[in-house]
Amino acid sequence: MTTTSAFMLNVRLDNVAVVAIDVPGEKVNTLKAEFAAQVRAILKQIRENKALQGVVFISAKADNFIAGADINMIGHCQNAQEAETLARQGQQLMAEIQALPVPVIAAIHGACLGGGLEMALACHRRICTDDVKTVLGLPEVQLGLLPGSGGTQRLPRLVGVSTALDMILTGKQLRARQALKAGLVDDVVPQTILLEAAVELAKKERLAQRTLPVRERILAGPLGRALLFRLVRKKTAQKTQGNYPATERIIDVIETGLAQGSSSGYDAEARAFGELAMTPQSQALRAVFFASTEVKKDPGSDAPPGPLNSVGILGGGLMGGGIAWVTACKGGLPVRIKDINTQGINHALKYSWDLLETKVRRRHIKANERDKQLALISGSTDYRGFSHRDLVIEAVFEDLPLKQQMVAEVEQNCAAHTIFASNTSSLPIGDIAANAARPEQVIGLHFFSPVEKMPLVEVIPHASTSAQTIATTVKLAKKQGKTPIVVSDKAGFYVNRILAPYINEAIRMLTEGERVEHIDAALVKFGFPVGPIQLLDEVGIDTGTKIIPVLEAAYGERFSAPANVVASILNDDRKGRKNGRGFYLYGEKGRKSKKQVDPAIYKLIGVQGQSRLSAQQVAERCVMLMLNEAARCFDEKVIRSARDGDIGAVFGIGFPPFLGGPFRYMDALGPGEMVATLQRLAALYGPRYAPCEQLVRMAERREHFWTNGETDQGN
């Protein structure tokens, strides 16, 4: 047996070489530049052994094949030429694997992503496990890049151009059965026989070539290709609004390879990779990736977490049902739901059933796995089954006396160590804990709706919350698959506080006569997933505006909204999508059509709806207020760092990730430019735009939020 630090070569008695991949000291296999020499040494031994019948690449890790290339390698590149060279080195290594004279099989279990999939594509065949952990994809676009080790050229030839474009442009990950159907893998087997199945495949002298479906063959021809690429360019431009240069380059590179041959395609891929690596968009997206990775490792406090074996939930409504699902089905923890009536419990159980049944229908999980996960959730109209719960999450109405009553009941009916976590979005945690016998075990845990989709949670300790309570709550959030940030117990916390002025300004422009669709389109063009008016419709106009009075009472007039407008809309029974009446028209459920503004909205608020501002002016008015408030939160230590502020905004409200978050964006603009812009807007629109003291100080001292010690690199 010959060993290297990350790759182990073992030639079996049946003359099949098994190359086991195991990056030492790491939970996950990633490809690093220094591994190239190790792989080449193994490939040399394989070429020299004339008795070999085949080769199998397999991971020695428990639940991943190769999760991608080490992104830190890109950060070490000083210019586009160095990044291009990095890509060419990867291409050359993959070409050497593909050129081996015997069948080469990739045996895949777990994540096979980015450079890992490019390596698998260089193998002659791929076989994977039917495990839920097994996913295959090329997610480089999410970092503002494209696959740089041959992925843009091999994937279209393997699965067809339309499937490849869809995978590479979106970064989507395919599960085992989806990969088999697409032709990405040749077989799907149980994990227990993965190696033997791969060895048997490697022994076959002739590996039959897969024929592409008729549709893909037509699209690969000159006429079909021209039509497809024209359509894809148009759709991609609509989706990205020109904010993500990687998508355009991906299309160009794939088209070059198909039209001019793979040699030209590989050359175009390497050049595009080098250029994209130096773009501000890729640098920002990589910064978000590293920041989110750091946040996920952050324990929240220096204290060790307490026990976390079971959870209780008070309230079986929309939020309670969603929290139950992420706790049981993602966290694997037993959940007991208490509601005042059985209808609430049934609603919460159905919520989880519907989500799990969708997974079964899509073949993501099997029916027995659905039943196993659902069995973790139970309910009661009293506190039976709560005595041993380690943490109880309260998800009842936003009513302070009611929440204080919940604290008292939990302290009476649960264990002495039980933590009480409130899902409040607006009430101070200190007030909720005011009458608590054990205030050190009361904390805020603010989820965003819909719970199963939104990745962020805010963990909110009040003045008396213990360090262990913080650590335990952060641990739970991570188990639930969430990205937690710890924020201070101040009105609006962080996310809602920076979102409110953004929404307020959109409503104010509406009262000035700007059209709904013009306001929303301007912010989508800026980079938000949806505009502020549509966002209000989606979360519920009543829900989205109820925090405004709380913020106005705490921080003054800068949070005041055109109250008569909001009241007029709510008095007209307009709550948004949830009751089919909002700023937009809602047709029959299930029908997909372009969103149309309800023309009655203009009459309701007494304007004609004629836009006068440019899209840039609309976006500037909304975004600058959000940035100014984020800077205040930094100054007041509502957030612990610029990192947390960026992650909170990107994951909590969809702040454009290609800008890196509000603090990286402010650093890019420069504090001097921020202050000058805010002063200009204040002169035009009033004192709500006055730059906060933090920005003025930073402009004077030429400081930045992200200090020089905080790099874009991962640790």
UniProtKB/Swiss-Prot annotation:
Report the Pfam families cross-referenced here.
3HCDH, 3HCDH_N, ECH_1
Question: Which reactions are catalysed by this chain?
Answer: a (3S)-3-hydroxyacyl-CoA = a (2E)-enoyl-CoA + H2O; a 4-saturated-(3S)-3-hydroxyacyl-CoA = a (3E)-enoyl-CoA + H2O; a (3S)-3-hydroxyacyl-CoA + NAD(+) = a 3-oxoacyl-CoA + NADH + H(+); (3S)-3-hydroxybutanoyl-CoA = (3R)-3-hydroxybutanoyl-CoA
The family database entries (SUPFAM superfamilies) matched by this protein are listed as:
6-phosphogluconate dehydrogenase C-terminal domain-like, ClpP/crotonase, NAD(P)-binding Rossmann-fold domains
Q: Which domain of life, per UniProt?
A: Bacteria
Q: Where in the cell is it found?
A: Cytoplasm
> Might you give the EC number(s) for this enzyme?
4.2.1.17, 5.1.2.3, 1.1.1.35
Q: Where is this site: Important for catalytic activity?
A: E118, E140
Q: Which InterPro entries match?
A: 3-OHacyl-CoA_DH_CS (IPR006180), 3-OHacyl-CoA_DH_NAD-bd (IPR006176), 3HC_DH_C (IPR006108), 6-PGluconate_DH-like_C_sf (IPR008927), ClpP/crotonase-like_dom_sf (IPR029045), Enoyl-CoA_hydra/iso (IPR001753), FA_oxidation_alpha_subunit (IPR050136), FadJ (IPR012802)
Where is the region 3-hydroxyacyl-CoA dehydrogenase?
Answer: 306-715
Q: In which pathway does it act?
A: Lipid metabolism; fatty acid beta-oxidation
Q: How does it assemble?
A: Heterotetramer of two alpha chains (FadJ) and two beta chains (FadI).
Its protein name is Fatty acid oxidation complex subunit alpha
